[in-house]
Regions:
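A short acidic, amphipathic alpha-helical/loop segment
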Residues: 99-106
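Conserved alpha/beta-domain cores
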Residues: 83, 91-94, 104, 143-162, ...
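Conserved, mostly hydrophobic/aromatic
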Residues: 38, 89, 111, 152
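An N-cap/entry alpha-helix motif that binds or orients negatively charged groups
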Residues: 15-76, 137-140, 145, 149-150
Length: 224
């Protein structure tokens, strides 16, 4: 493997294009395409952009040549899994596994898609995202909206097997809908998705916490 850091010209081009991209994001994309509209619209447009660009191979090649930086010092191994670098995207942003092709080509070391659930889930009523400018942060209450693990996991498998260097994992959650029942139902809900994910991604990850109906709602649903 030839590393970008070991090739003077490739390294110089990578640095210049990265600086250009950073400038363009700060002064053009961020003020005119993200913060001039609601967070929900900005998120949807970003996903749509990834869905379109992933089908343009010359553009993906160009992204990889310009933005993907490789250096042996960035490589790491965690619990037997090799990563090209430690920079990645955690679960929550790419719920339906639409972004791996683009992220792989711009140099991400890993992505966790989802969270996904055993059944398709509409999530909470919109808006899902609320900016908190005084804290430079955002409040999120999507409520596990996703197309369901029967759809998302095959996409993750395809992305993982075709990725050039990025590791792809899947976050598994309990379905957040009116069918949510008791503890046994919840365990089986997880198991359905875990069985679907077995051997089809680098790893399957249950989230440490998730939005779901309250315990009282669950008991009421189970009694119906």
């Amino acid at each position: 493997m030839t590393y970008v850091s070991e090739n003077f010209w490739h390294d110089a081009v990578n640095k210049a294009t990265t600086d250009l991209f950073t400038f363009g994001y700060k002064h053009i994309i961020k003020p005119h395409f993200i913060f001039n509209q609601t967070p929900d619209v900005a998120h949807s447009q970003m996903i749509d952009f990834c869905k379109v660009t992933r089908n343009i191979p010359p553009l993906m090649w160009l992204c990889r040549e310009m933005l993907d930086y490789t250096d042996p010092i960035l490589e790491t191994n965690v619990m037997g899994v090799d990563f090209a670098n430690p920079f990645g995207l955690s679960a929550g942003l790419d719920k339906d596994c639409e972004m791996p092709v683009l992220l792989d080509n711009v140099g991400f070391g890993f992505e966790t898609v989802g969270s996904t659930t055993s059944r398709p889930c509409p999530g909470n009523p919109r808006p899902w995202f609320h900016r908190l400018p005084e804290y430079d942060s955002m409040m999120v209450h999507v409520g596990l909206a996703n197309e369901g693990s029967a759809v998302v996991i095959p996409r993750a498998e395809n992305a993982w097997t075709k990725a050039k260097s990025m590791q792809v994992s899947v976050s598994i959650a309990r379905t957040n809908d009116s069918k949510t029942g008791d503890l046994d139902e919840g365990i089986e809900d997880y198991c359905i998705s875990m069985r679907r994910a077995a051997g089809r991604a680098r790893q399957a990850v249950p989230p440490p916490g998730q939005n779901r109906p309250s315990a009282a709602d669950a008991r009421q649903n189970a009694a119906q």
